[in-house]
C-alpha cells in the first residue's frame, strides 16, 4: 500500500523552496507568485510538433541531475548510468549531462534540452519534480522521465499543484511525463530485518534527511516493521537532520557525520540506517567510527561509498538504473505510458545489497528470511508499511 500525500507534499514544498531561491522555504511573499504561475519560465520548443526519429540510433537523450555532482556515487550517478545504458541498448549517442549549481538552475537546465529538441529528457530526483512537470506541460510532445517524482500531483490544467488538491489526471494531461516512483517501504523492510538480526543491544536507529520527505518516511516505516518482524521487542530510535533545509538534508556529509555521531552517543544504537542521500555518507562514516553497523540507501553503498564499506552491512536499494533504462526502451518501442510509473518488488524495482566483506557475519538463517520476504513481496502477500503509510506520526519521535 502506498500513501500519495507525503511523497507529493515534498514536491509542493520543494516548489516553494525553489521559487524563493532559498533552502529555508521562507517568505510567503516570495512564494505567492510561484503558486499563481509555477511554470512561468517553461516554454515550448520551436519547429512545430516534435517528431521522433524512425531510426532508434538517432534518438537524442539528455540528463538533468539534481544539485551536487553527476558522479555522486548515489542518485545522480545511478540515474545517469540508467540513461547511458538505455542509449547504449539503442545504439544511440551517450546522453549529455547538465548539473545545476543550485536549485535555481533546475528549470533552466531542463529548458536547455527542450530548446535543443531532445527526444527524451531524464531528470534526477524529487527536487526536479516541479521543473519537469512544467516542461512536460509546455511540451506534451516530448518525453520526460522524472526519477523519484511519482505520482505527479497536478491541477485540472496539468500544472504542479502546490495547494496539493491533485485534481488533475497526470496521465491524460501530461501524456509523455513518466514520473517514476518506488515502493520504499519494501527495501526498508528488508533493511530492518538485517538491522534487528545484526543488533546485539536490541537498539537500532534510523536518520532521515528531512521530515518533509515522503520517500524517507516510507523507508523508515518499512524499516520499523521489518525489524519488529525479526524482534518484536526491538527499540527503534528515529531522528531527522533538518525540517527545512534540503541542502543540509541530502548534500552535506560533514553535517551528516556530526549529526550521526551525536545520535549514536545519545541513543546507544549498534545498527544505523541512513536515509539522507549524500548527507548520509557522513552518517555512515559516523557509524564506522563508532564501530557499529551502517545500512545505506537507494544504491549499494558499500560500492558507491567505499569509505564506509567496512561497516556497511547492506543497503536498501531502488533499482534506479534499471527503471530508467527500461523506460527508455519502452518509450522507443512505443509501449510506455505517461503518469506514475511505479517500481516495486514485483518489477524487481527494489531490493537489498550484497553483504560484501561482512558476508561471514550474517547468519544463514537471515539470508533465507530475506529471500522469503522478498518472494512474499513479489507475491503481494507481505505487509511492509502501516495503514498510515507515509504518515510520519507513526514513527518514534
What role is predicted for each listed range?
Residues 1-12:
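N-terminal export and membrane-targeting signals
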Residues 3, 23-24:
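N-terminal targeting and processing segments of secreted/endomembrane and organelle-targeted proteins
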Residues 17-20:
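C-terminal motif of bacterial Sec signal peptides marking the signal peptidase cleavage site
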Residues 23, 29-397:
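A residue-level marker of the well-folded mature domains of exported/periplasmic proteins
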